[in-house]
Amino acid sequence: MFSYDNADMKFSDGERIHFIDRKGRQYPLTLCGGKVFQFSGEKISHDDIIGQEDGTTVTLSRGSKFIVLKPTLSEYILKMPRGAQVIYPKDIGTIIICGDIYPAARVVEAGIGSGALTMALLRAVGERGVVISYEVRDDFSKRAQENIQIYNGKTNNLIIREQDIYNGIGEEGVDRVILDLPEPWRVVPHAVQSLREGGIFLCYLPTILQVSTVVRALKESGSFIQIETSETLVRTWHVEDNSVRPDHRMVAHTGFITTARKVAV
């Protein structure tokens, strides 16, 4: 399992790792004692990797060298098995900052999907915080828990409720309500009851018509101020010697993020 609490950062049995070849290509692998990694007619035992330091170079049976790295959370999210469409790292970063997710926060989330956002929330709230995730689909819940287990290991600050958040939120005095749902406006009345004063409501939506509907619901509730909507566009650059230019492809629109602060009325 992967954990930054592991000071020596050595690879362990059951951990997800990335092989990086000389061209920078990544090959994900889950370590399992006794198994063998094979690549283009070459091989190396998983046992020869377990116990090695993060960032080490290993040599396969015919001499090819690979760098072995623990995946970052962003890399893991993009490679992990998916039961549902994930929120991409560029949007997760915006959610963590605009949602002001902090250590020891109590966060209600719906739905859990494949667990991408959940893992970032768990990291942000830390061991003293808690993430309560509402998810009606059992297959999504199971897939997310598997993904979280592989990357985070045993997690004590996650509570999964297989309930429909459209019918209500059982928690009171929570710090944040984070929604990745088709109709978040149906949750606004429940969020009013669940959020503490000063708490933040945040939702992630793919279309601007959905955004318009949820913003109207937030305003009509009379309980929210500072209602803002944004989207995050990311463009990488090619920088090589004297050749400096934007990459030909960029990650443009994926979704809109709407935030609002709850106040006493």
Model segments located where?
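Conserved class I S-adenosyl-L-methionine
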Residues: 102-113
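Glycine-rich helix-loop-beta junction characteristic of Rossmann-like nucleotide cofactor-binding loops
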Residues: 97-102, 124, 152, 169, ...
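Conserved SAM-binding loop and adjacent beta-strand
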Residues: 7-9, 79-92
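N-terminal auxiliary segments of SAM/dcSAM-dependent transferases
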Residues: 1-70
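C-terminal substrate-binding/active-site "lid" region of AdoMet-derived donor-dependent transferases
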Residues: 188-256
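Conserved S-adenosyl-L-methionine
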Residues: 101, 123-130, 197, 224
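Conserved SAM-binding loop of SAM-dependent methyltransferases across substrates and taxa
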Residues: 114-127, 193
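S-adenosyl-L-methionine
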Residues: 134-184
